[in-house]
UniProtKB/Swiss-Prot annotation:
One family name in Pfam for this protein: Sirohm_synth_M
Species this chain originates from: Xylella fastidiosa (strain Temecula1 / ATCC 700964)
Active site: D252, K274
Pathway entry: Cofactor biosynthesis; adenosylcobalamin biosynthesis; precorrin-2 from uroporphyrinogen III: step 1/1; Cofactor biosynthesis; adenosylcobalamin biosynthesis; sirohydrochlorin from precorrin-2: step 1/1; Porphyrin-containing compound metabolism; siroheme biosynthesis; precorrin-2 from uroporphyrinogen III: step 1/1; Porphyrin-containing compound metabolism; siroheme biosynthesis; siroheme from sirohydrochlorin: step 1/1
Gene name in the database record: cysG
Protein name: Siroheme synthase
Length: 478
């Protein structure tokens, strides 16, 4: 059974009653966590651990001695935690809480719980919660341990430093975008390093000096970012930084949802993708959007699949931005030929097979008509055709006519570097027939050359490459 997706939420339980059903070690841990946030725990159990007993005697908690009763919920309870080793008692407490529409957490029971208590990293007022939805708590605990080693106490002190000056910062930067950029600048500066060295006075002086400066005039900019091809893990660190600083993200159709989820949550995302068969946004309209938002002082990310300068019209966009005086930068990405080849186990160059690589766009018939097919037919080179699914029959015909041998191996990679990747292999003679037989659909990349034969024993990702089917007795190229 798949657990429901949980909505992440932090609760203010200060001076609010929480019923903990159970008096053992698990209940003790839950109660201790509640006391840390100022809650008013009410413990319902026949007996208590030594620590719970001591807290009850000193008035830190209230003890309802006995087995769970519905009447315990007559008090002003905000949350119920069932933490006994008796399933029937936990069930009774959960049913009663559900009947009164109370949030209830039953320890180690996803089905009975409507809230889960996450693993937490605490650094002063800074709290980072990690949850597996109750399905795999050990994963959450493991990740918490990893974060514990990465996030030291200075981050808690930095959080406190900002919190103490919250009103001053808001008054100095009333515009939310300007305020966000101020925080980003300070977070990238020396504050945290000074606090790590226990140099609190210097950190305070640095922040005060920053607040005393006249807020800079905001100017917009555009960053062309390559999202890589397929696997979101191929996104570069610079690309991730740009996504987290963006106000507006203009993204192409092939950019994955996983990559978009890495962006700053409140950044506006606008799809401007192009499709040969579906809705497309004109390049002129993309130019207008970049100009409009940059002139409004916003940081625009033009997010493209693969690399912006490899069949991505990035050059045209930079020329437009330069003409209109808009600041820009370019963050390269891993282009489809590199990503697809790597994930298919195909070295694009190889001392024994290929000394050069040619990247070719096969987007439309006019693109194919301009190619030097005689040069492409030369041996000992690897050809990578982008956007060429519809043009495969033409590619096969023109290469054969130009003298490329029909036995030249190829690999057709559909959804490269993605979980659903499919690799089809064969020879130039069977190229169009193979694509038709396996109903290949975009996005797909054609790699042609002797190196593609290596995919058969070098592949490592996804399913085994599929061999070309037997061609029909007659298969004129059309």
């Amino acid at each position: 059974m798949t657990a429901n997706v949980l909505f992440p939420l932090f609760a203010n339980l200060h001076d609010r009653a929480v019923l903990v059903v159970g008096g053992g070690k698990v209940a003790e841990r839950k109660t201790e966590a509640l006391l840390k946030v100022g809650a008013l725990p009410i413990i319902g159990a026949p007996s208590l651990t030594a620590s719970l007993q001591r807290w009850a005697e000193t008035g830190r908690i209230t003890w309802r001695q006995g087995t769970f009763e519905n009447s315990w919920l007559q008090e002003d309870i905000w949350l119920v935690i069932a933490a006994t080793d008796q399933p029937e008692v936990n069930h009774a407490a959960a049913r009663a809480a559900h009947a009164q529409r109370l949030f209830v957490n039953v320890v180690d029971d996803i089905a009975l719980s409507n809230v889960q208590v996450p693993a937490v990293v605490e650094r002063g007022p800074l709290r980072i919660a990690i949850s597996s939805g109750g399905g795999a708590p050990m994963v959450a605990r493991y990740l918490r341990q990893q974060l514990e080693s990465l996030i030291d106490d200075s981050w808690g002190r930095l959080t406190t430093l900002f919190a103490q000056r919250r009103d001053t910062i808001r008054a100095r930067y009333p515009n939310i975008e300007a305020r966000r950029r101020f925080f980003e600048t300070q977070l990238a500066g020396p504050l945290q390093r000074l606090l790590r060295k226990q140099r609190h006075a210097e950190a305070e002086a640095v922040l005060e000096a920053a607040l005393a400066k006249t807020p800079p005039t905001e100017s917009g900019s555009v960053t062309l970012v390559g999202a890589g091809a397929g696997d979101a893990g191929l996104l570069t660190l610079n690309a991730l930084r740009a996504l987290n600083e963006a106000d507006i993200i203009l993204y192409d159709r092939l950019v994955s949802d996983t990559v978009l989820q890495m962006a700053r949550r409140d950044a506006e995302q606008i799809e401007v993708g192009k499709s040969a068969t579906g809705h497309s946004v004109r390049q002129e309209d993309i130019h207008t959007l970049m100009l409009q938002h940059a002139r409004a002082g916003q940081r625009v990310v033009r997010l493209k699949g693969g690399d912006p300068f490899v069949f991505g019209r990035g050059g045209e966009e930079l020329e437009f931005l330069r003409t209109h005086g808009i600041p820009y930068e370019v963050i390269p990405g891993i282009t489809a030929a590199l990503a697809c080849a790597a994930y298919a186990g195909i070295p694009l160059t190889h001392r024994d097979h290929a000394q050069s690589l040619c990247l070719i766009t096969a987007h439309c018939q006019s693109s194919l008509d301009t190619l030097n097919w005689a040069a492409l037919a030369q041996e000992r080179q690897t050809l990578a055709f982008y956007m060429g699914v519809a043009g495969l029959p033409t590619i096969q015909q023109r290469l054969c006519e130009a003298g490329r041998t029909e036995t030249t191996p190829f690999a057709l990679i559909e959804n490269g570097a993605r979980a659903q990747q499919r690799v089809l292999t064969g020879t130039l003679k069977t190229l169009a027939h193979t694509a038709q037989t396996y109903a290949v659909r975009p996005p797909a990349l054609l790699i042609l050359g002797e190196v593609t034969a290596l995919a058969e024993h070098l592949h490592w990702f996804g399913t085994t490459p599929l061999s070309a089917p037997c061609p029909p007795r007659t298969h004129p190229i059309s």
